[in-house]
Swiss-Prot record:
It holds the Pfam family p450. Keywords: Heme, Iron, Metal-binding, Monooxygenase, Oxidoreductase, Virulence. PANTHER family: CYTOCHROME P450, CYTOCHROME P450 MONOOXYGENASE ASQL-RELATED. This is Cytochrome P450 monooxygenase ABA2. The lineage of its organism: Eukaryota, Fungi, Dikarya, Ascomycota, Pezizomycotina.
Amino acid sequence: MYGTNLLETMGKPTAGHLGMAVTFTPKAYRELHEKYAAPFTNRALLQQQDILRVHVDKLITALRAKARNKESVNMGEWSPHTQPDTYTTFDIIGDICFAEPFGCLDGGESNEWARAIINIFKAATWDQAIRRVAGTGTLLHKALVKIIIPAEAAQWRTIHFSNSKAKTLARLADPDRQHPDLIKHILDSEDSRAALSPTEIILNMVLFISAGSETTANTMTGWTYFMLRHPEARARATAEVRAAFASPRDIKWETVRALPYLNATLEEALRLFSPAPSNQPRVVPACGAVVAGCPLPSGTTVSVAPWAAVFSARNFADPERFAPERWLDEGGADPRYAADRRGASQPFSTGPRGCMGKNLAYFELRLVLAHLLWHFDLEPTDSAAGRECMRRWEQTDMDTYQTWMKPDLWVDLKEAQR
């Protein structure tokens, strides 16, 4: 809970514009949300299914080569040559935003922009604290950013903004290109085209690229860790996927949503390893509010710590246990978790300001995870380094900067035998 001057200090625009991340008045946020919402609907995602499949196929091809060469794969932190989760989500978000991927999966090596993304969250954590004191776009804000944000993180942030700007302007200059990307939706909407300036579009593309890649990659890696740690859950999810699909071409949005146990493992991974573990603040409206019996004046900011919510025994039975069964309904429900308050787990936040990319994230995650289990048997790498990585994933000493600074996670893959 914070003071009551947040609207005054954080609601000031930069060059006359605000991105969605720092738009605080409900009316302004609602207007922006409406202009960008179309590409994230289920209907739009179905049109983008072929885009996602291209990148998933590239991922599987790269992993198959590793499996055949008996090479371990790092599914975790940045690695010079193997960061499959991040490569996949980064290429997908590039294709969905700008009509062209960033080439990570094609090259198999980390490019400059991909390396920048994790540092965006480090810089943003510092910037969020600065804005609470100095406002947005003020002279004091700019001065404190230069003084306080670590130089390396600030440099990567500049690279991210510069690249996002260049890609956005290039796509806006090519309105006739027929590709169901986000900017195409804006160009095809007369209302959005008239209402959004290039500066506003750039500011939000900066957000979409970072929020739409690293957070989803974190979830994939976190899910992989839990499946490695719990072989019985891994075996059950694998059996479900392979029984459901005779061919990988059958793995589609419509069908993968109907796999109850795979989806339960995903929900449980999202609960225990939320892609956005930091608090998501909300502002008390003009009429005031009462929270947990405490009267709060207008303008007060409040938030709930996701970690506290999901690890509270008030909300979940045996909260530290990875138990996909707690998410199953009739036919597979476990009575031990019947009283769980599932709504306490909100990995994409909730309400009008909930993550507008939620549908896309679920689409990517289900598609990639189903393909991974259909094609490969997964095992933790049996080496000193592999065991140390598994220990570090116990989250007792893992840093967060709005998202997790995930350690390496070494995995051995074996092609499924049929």
